[in-house]
Amino acid sequence: MSLPRRAAHVAIRGYQLTLSGLVGRQCRHWPSCSAYTDEAIERHGLWAGGWMGLARICRCGPFGTHGIDLVPERLPEGAAWHRPWAYGRWRGVNAPATPLAEEVHDPLPGP
């Protein structure tokens, strides 16, 4: 792990062990915003992962998104170092597909 990535990891871990407990562990997403940012930086580097984390933190609020939101496996199409906002997903979540989402449930089954 490079020095900048390691420094970011230590800073995030420090936040998780200190301030996060004082603020209250009430993130609306899983994984938490700090864990998401840490994983994004580990997977995509400090620049891209940092922007992904910032976008996630901006979405986490009373009128923002919630639920399962995983770090993308690949960088978004069109993302480049000179267009940092393109790394982040500013709306919506990256939820895994579930078999239940495909099923149609009949609320009143027949005889």
From Swiss-Prot:
Q: Which Pfam families does the protein's record reference? A: YidD (PF01809)
A GO CC annotation recorded here is:
plasma membrane
- Top-rank lineage group of the source organism: Bacteria
Alphabetized InterPro entries for the sequence: Membr_insert_effic_factor_YidD
Cite the entry's keywords alphabetically.
Cell inner membrane, Cell membrane, Membrane
Q: How does it sit in the membrane?
A: Peripheral membrane protein
* Residues in coiled coil: none
Q: Which residues cross the membrane?
A: none
Query: Where found?
Result: Cell inner membrane
Database matches in NCBIfam families: membrane protein insertion efficiency factor YidD (TIGR00278)
PANTHER family according to UniProt: MEMBRANE PROTEIN INSERTION EFFICIENCY FACTOR-RELATED
Q: Which family does it belong to?
A: Belongs to the UPF0161 family.
The role this protein plays is: Could be involved in insertion of integral membrane proteins into the membrane.
Q: What is this protein called?
A: Putative membrane protein insertion efficiency factor
Q: Which organism is it from?
A: Methylobacterium nodulans (strain LMG 21967 / CNCM I-2342 / ORS 2060)
